[in-house]
Amino acid sequence: MTEPAIKAMIQLMDDSDQEVVHMVETQIRTLGPSIIPILESEWENLSLNPVLQNKIENLIHEFQMESMKTRLMHWKQSGAMDLLEGMWILATYRFPEYSFATLKKDMDQLYYEVWPQMRDNLHPIDQIKVLNGVMFDQLKFGANTKNFHAANNSFINVVLESKKGNPISLCVIYMWVAQKLGMPVYGVNLPNLFVLTHKQNGLQFYINVFNKGLIFNKIDIDNYIAQLNLTPNEIYYNPCSNLEIIRRVIRNLMMAYEKAGEQDYKDELNELIDLLD
């Protein structure tokens, strides 16, 4: 369909006949996300028609959601190997123009900040201390305790810019840098608190990134689980998958939107959970 024809259909979305509006919107939906640039262009030209602007916004969001679902499903079916890609896909939920290339560039820059200070002969705990020094003392990453439940804490682009996040977003950034440096650092799905573990050759310890990289051990997890009156489970001690991490990020977002009274966003995110189950 030609661009003029699409623009004519967009104008018909403002028709007084609701049957015409329904038919036109249905037809536009069949065209798919490729027409988003045309929709955006028309939106800019309709400042005096907020009702039609709102309809266009809803269509754009539907198309963006469709694209996001497709990317997320492809990511899962491809083995969910690249955690950074999964985090980028989630970020495009609210920041559709955000590119993976931009995310990769920003993450690489973090790596280059740490790499010159790392030494091959360092003990694993000392390696973590070096990483902590750069991430928390030099670069000033830290916990967003003032707005702990804010949705932006789960969007990696916002966390990289503000340097404030929740446990899982900070852990993802920290873990990616650590793994790029060759460290066997992985995520651990503790209840109410996402942490990391360094696990290799019989040596295992844990890292609380939300508390400036505090190092702790299995006994501390035992005590934590006991305080929560939970039965010990292997998942509280061992690495989890990238898929589990992305699921948890989505659930955090759902909770954030529920607390903010944004039920529509929560319902949409629940569709993503269904895709990944």
Predicted features along the sequence, with ranges:
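A structural boundary/capping signal
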Residues: M1-D277
